[in-house]
Regions:
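Basic, polyanion-binding surface patches
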Residues: 1-218, 224-236
């Protein structure tokens, strides 16, 4: 039997994407998000207009889409409630967001020079896509969200994921990190506690999930995943 519970969050399960862009001062930014999908050689990215990443993409016209594997969840969670914006609303502060301009340092990730665009790739991510902005579409009311259509210029893939002698990724070898209702999943199983789920008071945070084994850096923060739009960041 079906019911109509008035679902507030429609994040049924999509891959986490770490979007790298350049800030206005030239420094790199990372925003975790999961409102993304692909069609042929293009990607559609859903982002909040108040996010640093939205401003960077609109200004610079380029970005890199880095796909983390499920075993990279701790890197992602460290920046899940941070934003590169210098000013944060009182509501976001109450949720646990804070300003962080050095996302690479906080996450413990490594910059890798891109070949066709200015923003760096993330060395640790098995799949990296250098992209150029095609057009931005307004979504929703009050100019709150945008769907950025980007062209994938070049895709870099960890060699062990490629089926030998082909141009295809082995689906059994690739285990993407999935964001499902603000929780992290890999291989269909929860893989890590989520700062985002806690900040957004998701009821299922009361469940028992794997305890983080990292050093705890990035306490209380996130810039893309850390934004309501990790199926579409709103503040990163």
């Amino acid at each position: 039997m079906h019911t109509v519970p008035g679902i507030k969050v429609l994040y049924f399960g999509t891959p986490v994407v770490l979007i790298t862009t350049r800030n206005e001062d030239g420094t790199p930014n990372i925003a975790p998000m999961s409102s993304a999908w692909w069609l042929n050689g293009n990607a559609m990215l859903g982002l909040g207009n108040s996010s640093q990443t939205s401003a960077n993409i609109a200004r610079e016209g380029e970005c890199v889409l880095n796909l983390p594997s499920s075993d990279m969840v701790e890197y992602v969670d460290r920046i899940a409630m941070t934003t590169a914006r210098r000013e944060i609303s009182a509501y976001r502060v109450q949720q646990g967001y804070r300003t962080e301009r050095d996302k690479f340092g906080l996450a413990g990730l490594t910059e890798q020079r891109s070949e066709l665009v200015s923003p760096p790739r993330i060395l640790e991510c098995p799949i990296q896509m250098e992209c150029r902005l095609t057009v931005a579409h307004p979504v929703g009311g009050e100019n709150s969200l945008s769907a950025f259509e980007v062209e994938v210029l070049r895709t870099h893939v960890e060699e062990k994921l490629v089926i030998p002698g082909t141009h295809y990724i082995d689906p059994e070898a690739w285990d993407p990190l999935i964001m499902k209702f603000c929780e992290f999943f890999g291989g269909g199983q929860p893989v890590h506690t989520s700062r985002l789920a806690t900040g957004w008071n998701m009821p299922h945070t009361l469940r028992s999930l794997p305890v983080p084994q990292g050093d705890g850096s990035g306490d209380g923060s996130g810039d893309g995943v850390g934004e309501p739009v990790l199926s579409g960041s709103a503040s990163a």
